[in-house]
Amino acid sequence: MCLHHLRKCRTTNQGLHIRGRWTGIKLEIIPGAEEAQLLCNNLVENTESGVGNFAYVDVGGGSTEISLLHDGVLAESHSFNIGTLRMLAGAVTPEERNAMCRMLEKYAEDFPGTKIIGSGGNINRLFRLAKIKGDSRSLPVATLKQLYAELAPLSLEERMEQFKLKDDRADVIIPAAEIFLLVARSLKCEDILVPNISLADSIVDGIYRDVQGNMASKDNKE
């Protein structure tokens, strides 16, 4: 929830500048769309062709960030006030939920065969709980539905005991699963890609791409 508010706050850049002067360390907030582009570039480079339609879905406590990519290029990016903590507090409005669903359904019509790239600690934990065999990083939506059906009826303590979850994961994992299932239904997706790639890896990869591009441009001029 903190990152969501930092990205929206007008005074964030001023605050980061002041802290940079105090510490000598320059800080920068990466926009959700840029984060999605970095992670998607890294994912498609390591797993498959960049051709195709992807929905990068990052579920947080305060919001769900959805970035839509077509053939490796960012088409549009949206932020919805639908997060795990908001859902637990009953603070998600039907209007916000419907707005997200309508946007996704429209994208599915315009770009059929869209694949979901799931991001965040909850979807990674759900993937591990699913115990997918082999090297696949794809979580079938049917498996997620089954896992949700097992988790949802349990108390917080039962989830912690039976599924070895920490208390701060055992509560938010339920609304997180609900959000991903809602997104999958709206996009008519049967699988969710859960890459084992961190944002730090993707930033380094992005810097490498920039350096390679600058070197190639310099060579062409010479």
Residue ranges and their predicted role:
Residues L3-N53, L68-E222:
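Helical "lid/coupling" subdomains associated with nucleotide-phosphate turnover
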Residues V57-S63, S119-N122:
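A short acidic Gly-Thr/Ser loop motif
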